[in-house]
Amino acid sequence: MMLTAALTFGAGSAYAADLSQEGGTPSPEVTPELPLPTSTPKPTPVPKNGLLKEGKVYRYYVNNKPVRNKWKKINGKYYWFKSNGVAAHDGHYKIKGVFYLFNKNAQRIIPGKKSIVKVNGVKYFVDAKGRPVTGWNEFNGRMYYVHKNGKCATNETIGGIRFNKNGYASNLTQARCKLAARNFIARHSNANASNYEKFRSCFYYIMAYTNFVGYMDPTPQEFKTKDWVYKYSLQMFQNGLTGNCYGIASSVAAIAKELGYEPYVITIPDGHSFVMINGLYYDNMYGTLFGAATRPAYTIEHKIKF
C-alpha cells in the first residue's frame, strides 16, 4: 500500500513524493528514451554546364566536361577555349597560325573596322575582324610598326625609326621618307639584285629623271635642324623627283640608308649638297659622281647622318 506525503506551505499544499508503506523509499526515476539521430542525405551534385567564371578565368562545360581547343559563340561573343579548357583572355593568342585578340572577359575583340585597341595596357593594331595588321602602317596621321602578334612597337627603334611610349613614330616625316625610299627601290631596281646594284640603279635613275628647280632650298631655320633631309627627300619621292641638289642628296641618302649603308648629307657654303658614304662621294655635279674617291675641294657647312 502506498502513502502520499503532503507538504503544506501556507494555504496550499504540494505533493513531494510517493512513499511506500514499508519504509518510505522513493520509486526510481524513469529516463525517457531519446530518438536515434538520423543522417541527412547528401544532395546530388548538379553537373556543370555552359560558361562559368572560376576565379579569374572562364571555362565552358558540357555535362561537367570542359570544352577544349574550340571556338564557342555565346550571346553573340566569340570565345576560344585552350587545351587546358581556360578561355584565352587579356591579350593576343595564336590559333591555327593566326593571332587573335581577347579582352579581360575572354571575348574576342572584333572592332568592325581597322583600329588601335588597348588591352591590359598594351596597344594593338588590328583589322575589322581583330587580326593584326602587321608591318608599317600610317593611321590617323601617325606611323605605327606592328609586330606579328599585333602589338605596336613601343619604346624601341625599328629600321632606324624611333617609336615612343605611345606606340607611334616620334618623327612622322622620317618614317614616311623611309617607306617612300623603300617603294622607290622596289620600282626602280631588280628584286634579285645585290644592294650595291640596287643603289647604283636608283642613283642613276634619280640623276636622269630629276626635274631640277633652283628655288627648293631649305630655309635658314630648317638648316638649324637635322630633319630637313627627310622633308626634302620625301618631296622628291612624292613629286616626281622635283627638287634641287638638296633634294637629290637627301633622296640618294634615303635610298642608301634603306639598303643598309650609313650615308651622310654634306652641305657646303656654295649652296650645294652631296652624299658621303665610307669616304666616297655621291654627287649630281661633275658629271655625276658615284662612289668617287675624290671631288673638288670644299668646306663643310653641315654634315648630317641620315
Label the predicted regions:
Residues Y215-S273:
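Active-site neighborhood of thiol-dependent amide/isopeptide-bond enzymes
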Residues R176-F237:
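Secondary-structure boundary elements
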Residues N195-R200, K257-E262, L280:
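Loop/turn elements at helix/coil->beta-strand transitions in domains of secreted/extracellular proteins
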Residues A208-V213, P220, D270-H272, Y281, ...:
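Solvent-exposed loop/turn segments at secondary-structure junctions
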Residues M1-L179, T219, T267-P269, F274-G279, ...:
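Extracellular adhesion/carbohydrate-binding repeat motifs centered on closely spaced tryptophans
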